[in-house]
Design a protein with these regions (language model features):
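Conserved donor nucleotide-binding strand/loop of the catalytic core
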Residues: 1-27
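Catalytic-site signature of metal-activated, phosphate-bearing donor transferases
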Residues: 19-25, 32, 43-204, 210-211
């Protein structure tokens, strides 16, 4: 498919989420970068909006709304989408060094743009739990290096706040059980991140990828 559309295909050993994407950015030959993962795609309306904007760009980077697949359904129209910086000038942006959740950073003006893209998340609860278990383990050493303050308080409060942010703040309650599952697993992810960090501080031998 890529070759049919005159796209160049490059491969390299996996070097981590951020470095891998940065390598792809450096290989790109255009002025603008649209950063999408393999399980994401731009909607037709989003594509048209981007083309109109780039005809006379007002910024160096744009945050796009991401529509999340919630186990067995797309979100209700009233659900508030997360906005992520995904469109930017190549000369002004690069990936940060955060493991697992590496994201682009842009020097210059950044605006919101109503150009939605869709993310096909995990289709089953078990897949989601496996993923957040891996990701939370991958963040342990990074967070230990940052010397997170008030760890015990974060462990107690952040899971509840993560649930409320999605279920109430982002209106996931409009999505029935799928929205409830998504909010609860996000709360569990918040718990795992800080629980594993506390565990690693008490038993450094248990902070590896299999934790």
């Amino acid at each position: 498919i890529a070759r049919r559309h005159d796209a160049r295909i490059e491969t390299q050993p996996f070097a981590g989420y951020g470095p891998q994407k940065q390598a792809a950015i450096e290989l790109a030959v255009g002025e603008w970068i649209l950063l999408l993962d393999a399980d994401e795609h731009l909607t037709e309306g989003g594509r048209a909006t981007i083309l109109r904007e780039l005809a006379a760009p007002r910024a160096d980077g744009y945050r796009l709304p991401r529509q999340e697949w919630l186990f067995w359904r797309w979100p209700h129209a009233g659900t508030r989408a997360n906005r992520q910086l995904r469109l930017f000038r190549k000369a002004r942006g690069r990936m940060n060094k955060v493991p697992v959740h590496a994201a682009p950073e842009v020097e210059g003006r950044v605006l919101d743009l109503a150009a939605p893209f869709r993310h096909y998340g995990e289709p089953r609860l078990a897949d989601r739990v496996d993923k957040i278990n891996r990701y939370s383990s991958g963040l342990v050493e990074y967070k230990r290096g940052k010397r997170v303050r008030f760890l015990a308080l974060r462990l107690l409060l952040y899971p509840m706040l993560a649930f409320l942010k999605l279920y109430v703040g982002k209106r996931y309650f409009l999505n029935g059980w799928a929205g409830f599952f998504a909010a609860k697993t996000q709360a569990f992810y918040a718990f795992l991140k800080y629980a594993k960090l506390l565990e690693a501080g008490r038993d450094p031998n248990r902070s590896g990828p299999g934790a």
